[in-house]
């Protein structure tokens, strides 16, 4: 018996991508944005099909993503931001609510929401994950969005 496998590809179908970006910790976040845009363009997405929407911080990203998803104008949303642990419980609240909110948007609207929000213990970890030795999590989120758009298109065609 041959098992059938359905999986997404990184070939960019015609589609529009919204990058919802938290401005807080911008010294890290801008590297994530550059990585995401570069990955999308390298995989065939036209720059005219990429929109960057800036929110104040990670906590606000889910609401902005929800409004974007409601519009129905984008095939995927790529959430980018950075939450760096400090000396108070603030980190847990912001990171947790951002994560839950983005998952809820994806499930409620059926739009892929790729998670590129860094939740790290230190500035050093944030820098490592935004383009140095740990790669660029913005680029990884963009690839995840491409793959999900492709996968969902295949599932909807069945």
UniProtKB/Swiss-Prot annotation:
Pathway(s) annotated for this protein in UniProt: Cofactor biosynthesis; riboflavin biosynthesis; riboflavin from 2-hydroxy-3-oxobutyl phosphate and 5-amino-6-(D-ribitylamino)uracil: step 1/2
GO biological process: riboflavin biosynthetic process
Keyword Transmembrane helix part of the UniProt annotation: no
Active-site feature positions: 90 (proton donor)
Swiss-Prot/TrEMBL catalytic activity: (2S)-2-hydroxy-3-oxobutyl phosphate + 5-amino-6-(D-ribitylamino)uracil = 6,7-dimethyl-8-(1-D-ribityl)lumazine + phosphate + 2 H2O + H(+)
Sorted UniProt keywords: Riboflavin biosynthesis, Transferase
Residues binding (2S)-2-hydroxy-3-oxobutyl phosphate: 87-88, 129
One of the record's GO cellular component terms: cytosol
Amino acids binding 5-amino-6-(D-ribitylamino)uracil: 24, 58-60, 82-84, 115
Keyword Transferase: yes
Entry EC no(s): 2.5.1.78
InterPro entries linked: LS (IPR034964), LS/RS (IPR002180), LS/RS_sf (IPR036467)
One Pfam family cited in the UniProt record for this chain: DMRL_synthase
GO terms assigned for molecular function: 6,7-dimethyl-8-ribityllumazine synthase activity
UniProt subunit comment: Forms an icosahedral capsid composed of 60 subunits, arranged as a dodecamer of pentamers.
NCBIfam families hit by this protein: lumazine-synth (TIGR00114), PRK00061.1-4 (NF000812)
Family, similarity comment: Belongs to the DMRL synthase family.
Known function: Catalyzes the formation of 6,7-dimethyl-8-ribityllumazine by condensation of 5-amino-6-(D-ribitylamino)uracil with 3,4-dihydroxy-2-butanone 4-phosphate. This is the penultimate step in the biosynthesis of riboflavin.
Name listed for the protein in its UniProt record: 6,7-dimethyl-8-ribityllumazine synthase
Species: Pseudomonas putida (strain ATCC 47054 / DSM 6125 / CFBP 8728 / NCIMB 11950 / KT2440)
